[in-house]
Amino acid sequence: MVAHDNKKDDLVEWARFNKGTLALHNLYATGDTGKRIVEKTNLRVALLKGGSYGGDMEIGALIANGKVDHLIFFWDPLQSLPHDVDVKALLRIAVLYNVPTACNRATADLIISSPLFNNAEYEPAKEQAKK
């Protein structure tokens, strides 16, 4: 789970609302986003570096190695960031590896409410990572 500064509260609220479902999964999050999620939900989250310190790239590496089945990335389309190239690279790798990606609450709600979200046999990213 990743969120830009202006979207962190939205992602934390989404995680709180979906705590029961998320607790069944291995969760990864970048820096402050992950810390906030842990503080507000008590979910077990593997904390990576902050996005601008390489956390986005760490998530990308996890995707490339078949460790991420879904990407929840609430990004701010109205704010330009110094690490925009990292954001673009993360979104590119998610598409390349066929990882369902949510960039806002509505899409995240659709992904988590899909019967495929908890289906262990549905792993399109892992199939792509084997190539």
Name what the model sees in each region:
Residues 2-23:
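N-terminal phosphate-binding or glycine-rich loops at protein starts, especially the Walker A/P-loop
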Residues 24-33:
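Short internal beta-strands
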Residues 26, 43-53, 123-124:
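Short hydrophobic/aromatic-enriched beta-strand-loop microsegments
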Residues 28, 91-111:
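Short, acidic/small-residue loops that bind anionic groups at enzyme active sites
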Residues 44-47, 64-66, 89-90, 118-122:
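Short, hinge-like loop/turn segments at secondary-structure boundaries
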Residues 55-94:
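Mid-chain, well-packed structural core segment of small domains
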Residues 105-131:
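Short, glycine-/small-residue-rich phosphate/pyrophosphate-handling segment
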